[in-house]
Curated annotation (Swiss-Prot):
<feature type="binding site">
    <location>
        <position position="424"/>
    </location>
    <ligand>
        <name>Mn(2+) 1</name>
    </ligand>
</feature>
<dbReference type="InterPro" id="IPR046461">
    <property type="entry name" value="TerL_ATPase"/>
</dbReference>
<feature type="binding site">
    <location>
        <position position="523"/>
    </location>
    <ligand>
        <name>Mn(2+) 2</name>
    </ligand>
</feature>
<keyword id="KW-0460">Magnesium</keyword>
<keyword id="KW-0479">Metal-binding</keyword>
<comment type="subunit">
    <text>Interacts with the terminase small subunit; the active complex is probably heterooligomeric.</text>
</comment>
<comment type="function">
    <text>The terminase large subunit acts as an ATP driven molecular motor necessary for viral DNA translocation into empty capsids and as an endonuclease that cuts the viral genome to initiate and to end a packaging reaction. The terminase lies at a unique vertex of the procapsid and is composed of two subunits, a small terminase subunit involved in viral DNA recognition (packaging sequence), and a large terminase subunit possessing endonucleolytic and ATPase activities. Both terminase subunits heterooligomerize and are docked on the portal protein to form the packaging machine.</text>
</comment>
<feature type="binding site">
    <location>
        <position position="352"/>
    </location>
    <ligand>
        <name>Mn(2+) 1</name>
    </ligand>
</feature>
<keyword id="KW-0464">Manganese</keyword>
<dbReference type="Pfam" id="PF03354">
    <property type="entry name" value="TerL_ATPase"/>
</dbReference>
<dbReference type="GO" id="GO:0004519">
    <property type="term" value="F:endonuclease activity"/>
</dbReference>
<feature type="binding site">
    <location>
        <position position="352"/>
    </location>
    <ligand>
        <name>Mn(2+) 2</name>
    </ligand>
</feature>
<comment type="similarity">
    <text>Belongs to the skunavirus terminase large subunit family.</text>
</comment>
<keyword id="KW-0255">Endonuclease</keyword>
<dbReference type="InterPro" id="IPR046462">
    <property type="entry name" value="TerL_nuclease"/>
</dbReference>
<keyword id="KW-0540">Nuclease</keyword>
<dbReference type="InterPro" id="IPR027417">
    <property type="entry name" value="P-loop_NTPase"/>
</dbReference>
Amino acid sequence: MYYLNKMLEYNKENGIIINKYIRKTIQKQIRIHNKYIYRYDRVTQAIEWIEDNFYLTTGNLMKIELLPTQRWWYELMLGYDMIDEKGVQVNLINEIFLNLGRGSGKSSLMATRVLNWMILGGQYGGESLVIAYDNTQARHVFDQVRNQTEASDTLRVYNENKIFKSTKQGLEFASFKTTFKKQTNDTLRAQGGNSSLNIFDEVHTYGEDITESVNKGSRQKQDNWQSIYITSGGLKRDGLYDKLVERFKSEEEFYNDRSFGLLYMLENHEQVKDKKNWTMALPLIGSVPKWSGVIEEYELAQGDPALQNKFLAFNMGLPMQDTAYYFTPQDTKLTDFNLSVFNKNRTYVGIDLSLIGDLTAVSFVCELEGKTYSHTLTFSVRSQYEQLDTEQQELWTEFVDRGELILLDTEYINVNDLIPHINDFRTKTGCRLRKIGYDPARYEILKGLIERYFFDKDGDNQRAIRQGFSMNDYIKLLKSKLVENKLIHNQKVMQWALNNTAVKIGQSGDYMYTKKLEKDKIDPTVALTMALEMAVSDEV
């Protein structure tokens, strides 16, 4: 346990806190150490070979120097052997789960693991795989390995002499016929394999569990095999990531001598408030990533629930939902103003139409002296209002009494019934209707209204606005304007809708509007965002 002890000394000297999950892994190693063959020689050979031959391939081109924590990970991966049922000495550890905060060099570390296996692993004709959610992510790790063949003096010589070469199938070390290939997360393609080393990258993105399909082939056909699951945590629930976290926290897995879990994460959400605790999730912080970068992300997330979710998931290792309320009470506060700001002013319109069930909203915005002013006409049908529970009906009644919610005595929202109210707003304010944005799925229903107010030969005054993640930029722009008090509204129904509004966070960090509860209507928010997009389009 030489490298465990070195890591513990390093942590003490540098104020790195170990969470309860890593403490459990240490207890497990101590138990295993007393039962199996310790391979200090193999671990040290791997570490020295990596540090002698490999380079950082981003930033300054300099040789890799593994930190004590990373050396300990190598001790867990390579440090123990057992005698199998055939009397053969084999590597003990088949599975490693590394849950580690973003920016901690996981892919670079895995590149060294692959190359160590290809050149020093001694498995003639063996195959190694990197498996990822899609080809782009698989290529990220694959390219880390290939870059080493150009940066490393030793591998460059191998490369030039065609000992280490790139083929259509992947990378090959000719001396041992070992290969490294990339593969996407496809269960059918994974059937029947016989790989010896499997790197499952960013497992938080996986829906179905491909690991067993890959591991089955390795287990049945290889004496020495290892699968490594790496992730920075994520926002996709009920997939492979949740399954792995639950498994590697369990007592059953603690007593499985052929696996190690490295769950670097906070133990609860409250711990994020004390920066000293961040080392639980980012044990290499200060080296990778930099303290300043993580602090900046933390500060940017203040006042933004969606960014807070992402920070806790990707930096602090916590399983988080991919949906979060987006606007804070401070963002949605009312500011009184006079509708005269619209007088003779270019006015942009967004319309979110729902025939029944949700609200229909027509939002008007204009710009004046560096601020954006908004006013929204919100509609429902009386029969829907009458079916509300008492609490909701009291809330809607307040909106009706304030003149902010208009109840129509029809079975569903008829577009023709909106026209008198739009006319009334235009007459009362003297605004100049300029452009309209609308959901393309509703165009045929809205066509008459759109042509009435926004007809032009080229159609420049009308824009079909795609819904979902396509609205990402304008969702974030609306948030920014509200935070900076540059978007002014004075309607309680809009405040309510903004407070109801959640965002779903996509894999690339994009947002789309959603709601957590059916009773939480967000249509005024959507209409306002479309109107804002039209205002911006007129400036470009």
